[in-house]
């Protein structure tokens, strides 16, 4: 989700010992996060993208349930008040949120879940899922970041300036991540992202959750 003040909707922390893993990809706008994530999903059918809810208007080409679950402000607030969100934030006058129930259902079923999220949202998710894997995507330079924002043609010049100003404070939180990928050469960055995902799947607790019966049989606790 875009960066702004995030709010935790769940206060009870748990260790993520579900069969499925939870990945969070964080980046400033223009770093190439969505392009990398889409390529990863196309190559790895074992991961499902968590689709955020938002009250903003759809952009050209966006579809409900694919890029976002679009809803009215009243619908959003009703879901929030029922405790259906893991975290939520107000960004530039629009609301965004992550579904808690859906994520837990997927991971219990053994499916890996990936969140495209801002650093503040990642902090809130860690409060619920201590073992979530955070991956921070960085641009190769500030000049490259500005060029990418201009070339994608989605924002007015004043919005681009605002995004560049925000990028500095966002990237200052890269040390909080478990892994950092510099997206200079796309193919190399994608390979690194796939490596991170595979490494996380091989962690002891992740393997134990996926192969619980085997670990019991082998006497491993």
Curated annotation (Swiss-Prot):
Compartment(s): Cytoplasm
SMART domains to which the protein is assigned, alphabetical: GuKc
Reaction catalyzed: GMP + ATP = GDP + ADP
A GO MF term: guanylate kinase activity
EC number, as in UniProt: 2.7.4.8
One Pfam family matching this protein: Guanylate_kin
InterPro entries: GK/Ca_channel_bsu, Guanylate_kin-like_dom, Guanylate_kinase, Guanylate_kinase_CS, P-loop_NTPase
Domain Guanylate kinase-like as annotated: residue spans: 20-198
Keyword set, alphabetical order: ATP-binding, Cytoplasm, Kinase, Nucleotide-binding, Transferase
Sequence positions that bind ATP: 27-34
Cellular component aspect of the GO annotation: cytosol
Entries under CDD domains matching the protein: GMPK
Family, as annotated: Belongs to the guanylate kinase family.
Main function: Essential for recycling GMP and indirectly, cGMP.
Protein name per its UniProtKB record: Guanylate kinase
Natural source organism: Ralstonia nicotianae (strain ATCC BAA-1114 / GMI1000) (Ralstonia solanacearum)
């Amino acid at each position: 989700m875009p960066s702004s003040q995030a709010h935790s909707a769940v206060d009870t922390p748990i260790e993520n010992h579900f069969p499925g893993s939870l990945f969070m990809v964080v980046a400033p706008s223009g770093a190439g996060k969505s392009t990398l994530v889409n390529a990863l999903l196309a190559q790895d059918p074992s991961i499902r993208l968590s689709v955020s809810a938002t009250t903003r208007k759809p952009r050209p080409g966006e579809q409900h349930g694919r890029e976002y679950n679009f809803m009215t402000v009243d619908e959003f607030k009703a879901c929030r008040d029922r405790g259906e969100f893991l975290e939520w934030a107000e960004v530039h006058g629009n609301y965004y949120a992550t579904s808690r129930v859906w994520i837990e259902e997927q991971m219990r079923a053994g499916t890996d879940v990936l969140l495209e999220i801002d650093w503040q949202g990642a902090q809130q998710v860690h409060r619920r899922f201590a073992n979530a894997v955070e991956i921070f995507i960085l641009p190769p330079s500030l000049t490259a970041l500005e060029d990418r924002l201009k070339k994608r043609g989605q924002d007015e010049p004043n919005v681009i300036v605002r995004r560049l100003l925000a990028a500095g404070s966002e990237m200052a939180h890269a040390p909080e991540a478990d892994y950092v990928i510099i997206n200079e050469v796309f193919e190399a960055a994608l390979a690194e992202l796939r490596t991170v995902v595979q490494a996380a799947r091989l962690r002891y607790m992740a393997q134990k959750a996926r192969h619980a019966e085997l670990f019991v049989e082998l006497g491993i606790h």
